A protein has these predicted regions:
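Peripheral, non-AAA+ core regions of ATP-driven protein-machinery
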Residues: 3-148
Length: 148
Protein backbone atom coordinates (compact mmCIF):
# COMPACT_ATOMS: atom_id res chain seq x y z
CA UNK A 1 0.00 0.00 0.00
CA UNK A 2 1.36 3.38 -0.97
CA UNK A 3 0.06 6.81 -0.01
CA UNK A 4 1.04 10.32 -0.92
CA UNK A 5 -0.30 13.23 1.14
CA UNK A 6 0.64 16.78 0.17
CA UNK A 7 -0.67 20.31 0.51
CA UNK A 8 -3.39 21.07 -2.02
CA UNK A 9 -2.15 23.63 -4.53
CA UNK A 10 -5.20 23.93 -6.73
CA UNK A 11 -7.89 24.93 -4.24
CA UNK A 12 -10.07 21.88 -3.72
CA UNK A 13 -8.03 18.93 -2.41
CA UNK A 14 -7.80 15.91 -4.70
CA UNK A 15 -8.65 12.43 -3.45
CA UNK A 16 -7.70 9.46 -5.60
CA UNK A 17 -7.47 5.73 -4.96
CA UNK A 18 -6.21 2.99 -7.26
CA UNK A 19 -7.14 -0.56 -6.26
CA UNK A 20 -9.35 0.59 -3.38
CA UNK A 21 -12.84 2.09 -3.17
CA UNK A 22 -12.52 5.90 -3.24
CA UNK A 23 -15.72 6.32 -1.22
CA UNK A 24 -14.34 4.11 1.53
CA UNK A 25 -11.06 6.04 1.48
CA UNK A 26 -13.03 9.28 1.86
CA UNK A 27 -14.89 7.77 4.82
CA UNK A 28 -11.59 6.78 6.45
CA UNK A 29 -10.25 10.32 5.89
CA UNK A 30 -13.41 11.76 7.47
CA UNK A 31 -12.92 9.52 10.52
CA UNK A 32 -9.31 10.72 10.82
CA UNK A 33 -10.51 14.35 10.64
CA UNK A 34 -13.61 14.29 12.81
CA UNK A 35 -12.95 11.60 15.39
CA UNK A 36 -9.15 11.55 15.66
CA UNK A 37 -8.21 15.19 15.10
CA UNK A 38 -5.86 14.71 12.14
CA UNK A 39 -6.04 17.69 9.78
CA UNK A 40 -6.15 16.36 6.23
CA UNK A 41 -8.95 18.55 4.83
CA UNK A 42 -6.61 20.88 2.96
CA UNK A 43 -4.38 18.13 1.61
CA UNK A 44 -4.33 16.03 -1.54
CA UNK A 45 -4.45 12.30 -0.77
CA UNK A 46 -3.42 9.67 -3.30
CA UNK A 47 -3.66 5.98 -2.47
CA UNK A 48 -2.31 3.07 -4.50
CA UNK A 49 -2.62 -0.66 -3.94
CA UNK A 50 0.50 -1.95 -5.67
CA UNK A 51 0.55 -4.89 -8.04
CA UNK A 52 -2.54 -3.85 -9.97
CA UNK A 53 -4.94 -5.62 -7.63
CA UNK A 54 -8.23 -4.34 -6.24
CA UNK A 55 -8.96 -4.97 -2.56
CA UNK A 56 -12.44 -4.86 -1.05
CA UNK A 57 -11.70 -6.55 2.29
CA UNK A 58 -12.33 -4.08 5.13
CA UNK A 59 -9.50 -5.68 7.12
CA UNK A 60 -7.17 -3.46 5.08
CA UNK A 61 -8.63 -0.27 6.63
CA UNK A 62 -6.00 -0.06 9.37
CA UNK A 63 -3.17 -0.46 6.86
CA UNK A 64 -4.69 2.30 4.69
CA UNK A 65 -4.97 4.66 7.67
CA UNK A 66 -1.38 3.99 8.73
CA UNK A 67 -0.08 4.48 5.19
CA UNK A 68 -1.87 7.85 4.93
CA UNK A 69 -0.61 9.01 8.34
CA UNK A 70 2.91 7.84 7.49
CA UNK A 71 2.92 9.99 4.37
CA UNK A 72 1.32 12.96 6.14
CA UNK A 73 3.89 12.88 8.96
CA UNK A 74 6.73 11.92 6.61
CA UNK A 75 7.72 9.07 8.92
CA UNK A 76 8.28 5.63 7.40
CA UNK A 77 6.71 2.54 8.95
CA UNK A 78 9.01 -0.44 9.47
CA UNK A 79 8.62 -2.73 6.46
CA UNK A 80 8.33 -5.74 8.78
CA UNK A 81 5.09 -4.40 10.27
CA UNK A 82 1.62 -5.28 9.00
CA UNK A 83 -1.95 -4.41 9.97
CA UNK A 84 -5.31 -6.14 10.01
CA UNK A 85 -8.35 -4.26 11.26
CA UNK A 86 -11.55 -2.60 10.12
CA UNK A 87 -12.04 1.04 11.09
CA UNK A 88 -15.43 2.07 12.48
CA UNK A 89 -17.00 5.52 12.18
CA UNK A 90 -15.88 6.55 15.65
CA UNK A 91 -12.24 5.63 15.01
CA UNK A 92 -12.37 2.26 16.73
CA UNK A 93 -10.47 -0.71 15.36
CA UNK A 94 -12.97 -3.49 14.83
CA UNK A 95 -12.34 -7.21 14.84
CA UNK A 96 -11.97 -8.98 11.51
CA UNK A 97 -12.72 -12.58 10.59
CA UNK A 98 -10.10 -15.31 10.16
CA UNK A 99 -7.58 -13.43 12.31
CA UNK A 100 -5.57 -16.56 13.19
CA UNK A 101 -5.07 -17.30 9.49
CA UNK A 102 -4.11 -13.67 8.83
CA UNK A 103 -1.55 -13.68 11.66
CA UNK A 104 -0.09 -17.00 10.51
CA UNK A 105 0.15 -15.79 6.90
CA UNK A 106 1.82 -12.53 8.00
CA UNK A 107 4.44 -14.55 9.87
CA UNK A 108 5.02 -16.82 6.85
CA UNK A 109 5.58 -13.72 4.71
CA UNK A 110 8.33 -12.57 7.09
CA UNK A 111 6.55 -9.85 9.06
CA UNK A 112 7.85 -9.39 12.61
CA UNK A 113 4.81 -7.62 14.08
CA UNK A 114 1.13 -7.21 13.32
CA UNK A 115 -1.40 -4.71 14.66
CA UNK A 116 -4.90 -6.10 15.19
CA UNK A 117 -8.05 -5.14 17.06
CA UNK A 118 -8.03 -5.83 20.78
CA UNK A 119 -11.52 -7.27 20.23
CA UNK A 120 -10.20 -10.13 18.08
CA UNK A 121 -9.87 -13.50 19.75
CA UNK A 122 -6.67 -15.14 18.61
CA UNK A 123 -4.11 -17.78 19.49
CA UNK A 124 -0.43 -16.86 19.56
CA UNK A 125 0.83 -20.32 20.53
CA UNK A 126 3.90 -21.29 18.56
CA UNK A 127 4.16 -17.94 16.79
CA UNK A 128 7.24 -15.73 16.72
CA UNK A 129 5.41 -12.69 15.32
CA UNK A 130 4.69 -9.92 17.81
CA UNK A 131 0.94 -9.24 18.06
CA UNK A 132 0.01 -5.70 19.08
CA UNK A 133 -3.63 -5.20 20.02
CA UNK A 134 -5.26 -1.76 19.92
CA UNK A 135 -8.80 -0.46 20.21
CA UNK A 136 -8.47 3.00 18.59
CA UNK A 137 -6.50 4.61 15.76
CA UNK A 138 -4.82 6.96 18.24
CA UNK A 139 -3.16 4.01 20.02
CA UNK A 140 -1.60 2.77 16.78
CA UNK A 141 -0.51 6.32 15.89
CA UNK A 142 1.23 6.78 19.26
CA UNK A 143 2.94 3.42 18.99
CA UNK A 144 4.21 3.99 15.44
CA UNK A 145 4.94 7.70 15.32
CA UNK A 146 5.46 9.03 18.85
CA UNK A 147 7.85 6.50 20.35
CA UNK A 148 11.32 7.77 21.17
Amino acid sequence: IQSLVSSAVYGTPQRSATGFDTKRMNMLLAVLEKKCGFRLGSKDVFLNITGGIKIEDTAIDLAIICSILSSDRDIAIDTQTCFSGEIGLSGEIRAVNRINERISEAEKLGYKQIFISKYNKFSDKGLAIKIITCSKIEEVFKYLFLKN
